[in-house]
Amino acid sequence: MSRQSLTKAHAKITELSWDPTFATPATRFGTDYTFEKAPKKDPLKQIMRSYFPMEEEKDNRVYGAMDGAIRGNMFRQVQQRWLEWQKLFLSIIPFPEISAARAMPMAIDAVPNPEIHNGLAVQMIDEVRHSTIQMNLKKLYMNNYIDPAGFDMTEKAFANNYAGTIGRQFGEGFITGDAITAANIYLTVVAETAFTNTLFVAMPDEAAANGDYLLPTVFHSVQSDESRHISNGYSILLMALADERNRPLLERDLRYAWWNNHCVVDAAIGTFIEYGTKDRRKDRESYAEMWRRWIYDDYYRSYLIPLEKYGLTIPHDLVEEAWKRITDKGYVHEVARFFATGWPVNYWRIDAMTDKDFEWFEHKYPGWYSKYGKWWEEYNRLAYPGRNKPIAFEEVGYQYPHRCWTCMVPALIREDMVVEKVDDQWRTYCSETCYWTDAVAFRSEYQGRPTPNMGRLTGFREWETLHHGKDLADIVSDLGYVRDDGKTLVGQPHLDLDDPKKMWTLDDVRGNTFQSPNVLLNEMSDAERNAHIAAYRAGGAVPA
């Protein structure tokens, strides 16, 4: 289609939009933003006629690659360590995709721009397609991988797992609260423009290095749609900037959106890339190096900083703090250790780091071994049942962490934990920004201005409180993380499937009572709580 005819077709489509004059349309998805002065343009002029043939070709390539992987015996070559982590990743990622599809009607309802509506409708179809091909990828892994246990329960496990529910919080952020906050700033301006770089570009590179060339095929097909989504987000952002009343809301939302994306996406993707790989070439980029290139340089410096020319205050401090958490404070390494600590309630297996892994980590992150090496050696020592408990219940110098109420990732950088009484409950937060998000941003008033559409962070946000006082075996059984024999756990702290004696069963984990740190915190006296918090922040043992 020629550019001229495309422009004419696009203009014709916008004529189909109309506003009723006989009644005031009901506002289904509310926003506190105003758009009376907004320019109405769609720079990409997206229309269905040119869209569908392109997507059909991409789908043909994806499904052709899936067929080729089976015929080419890819599953004889792929690393088990890598595919085990895909049980968690592929249980989570289709949900944010389908949530993004659900977010598009929110944006259409909130933004008075017929041109943008067309692009948002195209994006909705994109997101449904992304979720579909990811679900098909997961099914193919399940049908062909040596250990399908975990892949076969991902939709159920995602919803009741201590890690999966972090991903659920992330995806629900696209469809809850203020429509522009959720569907545009949080989803499109930050998540899609910044963090899909590590998600859909850096991670496929790691997959290929571990013998998995299906994930790169699928996720590069996804990423090739993101330029249109970025255009949608930028167009709505410029519309919002046209009205000075929106500036405080934009600055609020950029802080919240940036920090929550960092907390969740860097925790997950950083762990998958750093701890899910067997490729330990010294010239391979670490996650910190990838982050510097894909997010700090390509997003922050090229996209975010130029917004200052519109008078917008950019959260420079939060970008620098995120970088510091990754490089200096060991954020990704703390997340990996936390996931490994929780192996009995995982639906994927996590093997111990080896000497080769130690050498690579020490090369990329000097001082890594002194902080994490001994713990991973203990993890390896306690890998098999019979003589010990699961590592979470052994004395290995690791205190089970408090959960962040906002992002739901635990407060793993312990010196930064914030404890405050909010809504008559003592809550823990991983950082000052997560506390601000709960206590200030998601409230009915912001800087003296009513913000009734923001909503609140509510619900059972701490997985641990749901299982306080239960026996570990009962928790695993209730969650459904048991193999077909009715006794062997799906999660294991090793990759040895050949010897049944090395596989942990319900009987092996029975007798260990699980306790919620937050429940215990709220039961403490003021003096006990203060002492507990001080010890936790110091990284030491909790006083008796």
Swiss-Prot record:
Assembly notes: The propane 2-monooxygenase multicomponent enzyme system is composed of an electron transfer component and a monooxygenase component interacting with the effector protein PrmD. The electron transfer component is composed of a reductase (PrmB), and the monooxygenase component is formed by a large subunit (PrmA) and a small subunit (PrmC). Probably requires the presence of the chaperonin-like protein PrmG to ensure a productive folding, resulting of a soluble PrmA, which leads to the active form of PrmABCD.
Reaction(s) the record says it catalyses: propane + NADH + O2 + H(+) = propan-2-ol + NAD(+) + H2O
Binding sites annotated in the UniProt record for Fe cation 2: E127, E192, E226, H229
Keywords: Iron, Metal-binding, Monooxygenase, NAD, Oxidoreductase
Protein family per UniProt: Belongs to the TmoA/XamoA family.
Disulfide bonding pattern of the chain: none
Molecular functions per Gene Ontology: metal ion binding; monooxygenase activity
Gene disruption: observed consequences: Cells lacking this gene are unable to grow on propane and to degrade N-nitrosodimethylamine (NDMA).
Keyword Ribosomal protein: no
Cofactor dependence: Fe(2+)
Assigned EC number: 1.14.13.227
Full protein name: Propane 2-monooxygenase, hydroxylase component large subunit
